[in-house]
Amino acid sequence: MNMNKLVKSSVATSMALLLLSNTANAEGKITPVSVKKVDDKVTLYKTTATADSDKFKISQILTFNFIKDKSYDKDTLVLKAAGNINSGYERPNPKDYDFSKIYWGAKYNVSISSQSNDSVNVVDYAPKNQNEEFQVQNTLGYTFGGDISISNGLSGGLNGNTAFSETINYKQESYRTTLSRNTNYKNVGWGVEAHKIMNNGWGPYGRDSFHPTYGNELFLAGRQSSAYAGQNFIAQHQMPLLSRSNFNPEFLSVLSHRQDGAKKSKITVTYQREMDLYQIRWNGFYWAGANYKNFKTRTFKSTYEIDWENHKVKLLDTKETENNK
């Protein structure tokens, strides 16, 4: 089969877009609010909300930490976004002869957006910068009067004045975390993207790697292999975990609410995976690979109402979106 014909045919096909919005079908649970009085000034209110997309194998676990501080003129909400995003990996057909393909999890996106007026703003977040470490770890600390600190590690930077702390800890082997370009006082987002992938000691390779003869050798097992196309990919267990299995995100955002503003506001939390199409073909002399970015996208959004006065949240809506090239 000719790869160029297949790609042209795929691109020529109109984009498939399916929007599903139905809160009744979403599996959402919200725990009762727990209250912890730190001292005569600070009280903490905590609740956890979960929402799942069984179809996309995406789950959101959101921990809402409300901080009521009498020494500060604003309400503070520390939101931890955790859960699971499946890679969507689709293995090759071992019977494919001279052409074969896989779909793999190339990038994961998480964003938090404040759907309100200027009374609610995003004032801090973690991670704050690009990170290429194997394991990302940050600790957020809140001290009296609204001071927020974010440090590397799981406990660094805290002191005796810390009234509240929260941590994030996730693994991203061969991937890197970047901050979304549209991060501002209303939105914050992160992308965890395949960055430096090794192939049996060769590489590193990325989504855009290219060799003038062999193309992108990201997951190609052998240039001169006599195996069928469907058996000439590197073994699944040799691929990075995030490319073939699941990503377990953990991100933090801090929202500030002006006390003379509206008592309720809305936020939208978005989890998304981008799947690339990776192909190999035999041209009669050697094998060559090609990677096509963002060939399939699966997005799961949940919208919550935030009750700042009673320190509660309510799931308003969920939406599943498919985007196929």
Swiss-Prot record:
Q: Which GO terms describe its molecular function?
A: toxin activity
- Keyword line: Cytolysis, Hemolysis, Signal, Toxin, Virulence
Listed under GO cellular component are:
extracellular region
InterPro entries given for it?
Bi-component_toxin_staph, Leukocidin/Hemolysin_toxin, Leukocidin/porin_MspA_sf
Q: Give the Pfam families listed for this entry.
A: Leukocidin
Coiled coil (residue ranges): none
Q: Which GO terms describe its biological process?
A: cytolysis in another organism
Question: Keyword Signal: yes or no?
Answer: yes
Signal peptide coordinates: 1-25
What family does the Swiss-Prot or TrEMBL record give for this protein? Belongs to the aerolysin family.
Function summary: Toxin that seems to act by forming pores in the membrane of the cell. Has a hemolytic and a leucotoxic activity. Promotes host AMFR-mediated inflammation by mediating 'Lys-27'-linked ubiquitination of TAB3, TAK1-TAB3 complex formation and phosphorylation of TAK1/MAP3K7. In turn, activates host NF-kappa-B signaling pathway.
The subunit structure is: Toxicity requires sequential binding and synergistic association of a class S and a class F component which form heterooligomeric complexes. HlgB (class F) associates with either hlgA thus forming an AB toxin or with hlgC thus forming a CB toxin. Interacts with host AMFR.
Q: What is this protein called?
A: Gamma-hemolysin component B
The species is Staphylococcus aureus (strain MRSA252)
